Amino acid sequence: MALLELRNVIRRFGDFTAVDNVSLSIQAGEFFTLLGPSGCGKTTLLRMIAGFDVPDSGQILLDGQDIANTPPEKRPIHTVFQSYALFPHMTVADNVAFPLKMSKVAPAEIKKRMEKALEEVQLSRFTHRFPHELSGGQKQRVAFARGLINRPRLLLMDEPLGALDAKLREDMQRELINLQKEVGITFIFVTHSQDEALALSQRIAVMNLGNIEQIGTPSAIYGTPANRFIADFIGKINLMEARVTQISNTAMTLEINGLGTTVLPPKKEIQAGDQGVIAIRPEQVAVHALAKQAEIPHAHTGKVLDFLYVGDVTTYVIELDSGIQIEALLANSSPGRARFFEVDDPVIVSWPQEAAQFLVDRP
């Protein structure tokens, strides 16, 4: 049985439906992420799990018991917010111990569990400091320690890394993964950052307009997106309009606007005449000098419009002879070499046939 199960959960605010008939299940010990753009309903869903909001209909089951109308203080759930929510007049030790003091736990037990929680987040030396004496990352770890001290069944995190700089955010991601493995508590993480979701999660639910578009592992979400929205939202991708012209038990022939035909394996739900897009990730696009054209099958000629050098990789924007623009991501493998091609260089682009996916448009 799943630790947490949502069944047909709906939440409306007037005429606006923030969460639209959402169902999902989360296993014990899982690191699960709700990912989506601003306004997609992910925070509203998290608030209903926490008990800060109540669904208009549907069930929220924890260990098989419906808690949709249970007050937040009666749920074995803790929430960590982006703002840390630390008491400025309390030391680190007192901030972490606060939930146990409110529960009237014995002082000796409080001290033992407080020290254990701070050890788990590597802050044992900071017990007597106040929040204003801590860095952003240290404050966030205090918030995590306070969330874990009661050993909740679920730890909910509402964009907890959003206020940190890029380097600190990356460090905290590693610490969160290790912390979750160590304590074994189910983490539910809310973010609009695709990179955070892919780096942290065992499974991801991608939300849009109050609906869950796809649930899967990071590699499945990134590698086999269910539709155009997910393909475009998760990482960079090239999308080219296409139409299915023929389909059989063994092959599906597509006409790509401006690029001719390509053949892909068939899919059960796709029929001849279906419109959609061919999706190809930039890192799957190869770029060659024009002189190699005869050696490369299924190649397309064009010229470099622009490039972005970021140290380890360079992203090229290439305009094909047909007018279609393609992005390609190339590793800067040669030491000290900033890039391979210049603006206006004539080039050839190609990609493995198996790298292309057809995503059908559905109403």
Curated annotation (Swiss-Prot):
Residues 4-234 form the ABC transporter domain. Keywords: ATP-binding, Cell inner membrane, Cell membrane, Membrane, Nucleotide-binding, Translocase, Transport. It catalyses: ATP + H2O + polyamine-[polyamine-binding protein]Side 1 = ADP + phosphate + polyamineSide 2 + [polyamine-binding protein]Side 1. It is a peripheral membrane protein. Its main location: membrane. Its EC number is 7.6.2.11. It is found in: Cell inner membrane. NCBIfam families: potA. The complex is composed of two ATP-binding proteins (PotA), two transmembrane proteins (PotB and PotC) and a solute-binding protein (PotD). Part of the ABC transporter complex PotABCD involved in spermidine/putrescine import. Responsible for energy coupling to the transport system. Belongs to the ABC transporter superfamily. Spermidine/putrescine importer (TC 3.A.1.11.1) family. This is Spermidine/putrescine import ATP-binding protein PotA.
